[in-house]
C-alpha cells in the first residue's frame, strides 16, 4: 500500500508520522507499519491524500476486532537504552574495562518499561516494537496491544528515573543470553489513535448508460430525473496534419 485517502481536509497527520494499518487476512488480522511522506489536502473534496513509505518489510499477525488505520502518536525507547557500559571491578578495584550489562531479571518479554513516563498510552491501544532479531541481527517487528499500564520509578543499569511499564499481548523477542544491547536496538511506537478513512475517488470520468451508487436509495423509479455534479472532462481534439504532396 503506497497511499491512503483520509476523511476531512484538516487531518491531524503530518509528514513523518507512523501509521499502523490493520487488515483482515481471512482467519484474523494482519498489521504493517508505514511512514507518511506526503500529505495533500483538498478542502473542496473534504479529504486528504496521504502517500506512504514501507517500514515493516512484511505484515505480522495482530490481535484486533476490526480493520482500521491508526496514527502512532509516540515513538519511544525502552528504559536503559542510553545506559553507559558496566564498569568491571575485581576485589573492589576498577579494572579499566567496561562490558555490556546483562538484562535485568525483571525484563520479561511480556513486559516493557519505557524510558519516560507517558500518560497517554492506554489499555487496549496498539503497540509496535521494532528490534534486531537476536539470532540473525535483521530487523523485526512485533505487533500487539497494551493489556496494562503502570507508571513507576526504575533503577537499572546504573540509571534511575521515571518510566511507564507496558504489559503486552504479544511479547518481544530475546534469547537466554541476550544483553542490554538488544534493548538499545529497540524502538517502540505506541499511543495509537484511529483515523477515519475516505472513499477512494474515481480516477476516470463517469460515463455510459448505467451508474452504480454506494448505497441503497429508496424511491428511485424509471423516468425519475437525476442530477450529476462534478467537473466535465475536457477533451482536446487535434486535427491531423495534411498529407504532404
Model-found features: residue ranges?
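Intrinsically disordered, low-complexity, polar/charged repeat-rich segments
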Residues: 1-245
Amino acid at each position: 500500500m503506497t497511499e491512503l485517502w483520509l476523511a476531512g481536509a484538516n487531518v491531524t497527520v503530518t509528514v513523518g508520522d507512523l501509521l499502523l494499518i490493520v487488515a483482515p487476512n481471512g482467519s484474523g488480522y494482519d498489521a504493517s507499519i508505514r511512514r507518511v511522506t506526503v500529505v495533500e489536502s483538498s478542502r473542496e473534496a473534504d479529504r486528504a491524500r496521504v502517500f506512504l513509505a514501507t517500514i515493516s518489510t512484511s505484515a505480522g499477525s495482530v490481535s484486533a476486532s476490526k480493520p482500521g488505520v491508526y496514527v502512532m502518536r509516540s515513538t519511544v525507547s525502552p528504559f536503559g537504552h542510553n545506559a553507559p557500559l558496566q564498569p568491571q571491578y575485581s576485589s573492589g578495584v576498577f579494572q579499566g574495562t567496561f562490558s555490556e550489562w546483562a538484562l535485568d531479571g525483571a525484563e520479561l518479554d511480556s513486559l516493557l518499561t519505557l524510558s519516560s513516563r507517558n500518560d497517554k498510552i492506554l489499555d487496549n491501544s496498539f503497540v509496535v516494537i521494532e528490534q534486531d532479531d537476536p539470532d540473525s541481527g535483521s530487523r523485526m517487528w512485533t505487533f500487539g496491544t497494551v493489556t496494562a499500564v503502570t507508571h513507576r520509578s526504575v533503577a537499572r543499569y546504573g540509571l534511575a528515573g521515571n518510566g511507564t511499564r507496558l504489559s503486552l499481548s504479544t511479547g518481544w523477542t530475546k534469547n537466554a543470553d541476550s544483553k542490554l544491547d538488544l534493548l538499545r536496538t529497540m524502538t517502540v511506537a505506541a499511543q495509537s489513535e484511529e483515523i477515519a478513512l475516505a472513499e477512494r475517488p474515481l480516477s476516470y470520468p463517469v460515463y455510459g448508460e448505467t451508474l452504480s451508487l454506494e448505497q441503497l436509495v429508496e424511491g428511485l423509479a424509471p423516468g425519475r430525473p437525476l442530477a450529476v455534479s462534478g467537473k466535465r472532462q475536457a477533451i482536446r481534439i487535434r486535427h491531423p496534419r495534411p498529407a504532404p504532396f
